């Protein structure tokens, strides 16, 4: 008899299901192989340097003791806020003022304004008038390789000079920022958020800020200002009251 070839077709749904199942199996196999090559690493303070290398920037910290002629200011940089230590030395001479630390023109002007202000209030602080003709003054900002400019270090320089000529130490845990005028007014500055963060990182307890920056302080998140005693000042008299260990 005649044989007939019988062909049975596989339903399309069944073929698609089989292909999907194969795909899932391949995905599981790939995931298993990937997991076998994956190592879980926990990074903490103990091994952070091993993975990221040495720190690029050293964290500045406040001094251990109150000192004469040394005041911590606050600065804004292109990579955030920073603290700025200003040092003033008084030595025998004839009234010369030496400015070092790569100060820009605006900062040099601020230093001269600060000096003029301190001279104008010398009698109030019982400073002998001839000190400005028989002594030289050296104002220095460390990290001399880094250029520095701007008027916001005015109050810091004025405080450092005042401390140096009176012999009154400055609280080590106080930092400040603000432009100063010849009459001792404290003018507003910019970059306040970054400066406050820098102060907090350095361990500063009290920050002196121009009163006209009050609105900027109000806009800061609580986690930034928490733990800081922020004082609003409008005159150098107030700055001296808060910064000097004993105000005259």
What are these regions (language model features)?
Residues 14, 18-19, 27-48, 54-72, ...:
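Peripheral, non-AAA+ core regions of ATP-driven protein-machinery
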Residues 1-9, 74-79:
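AAA+ ATPase "lid" subdomain C-terminal helix
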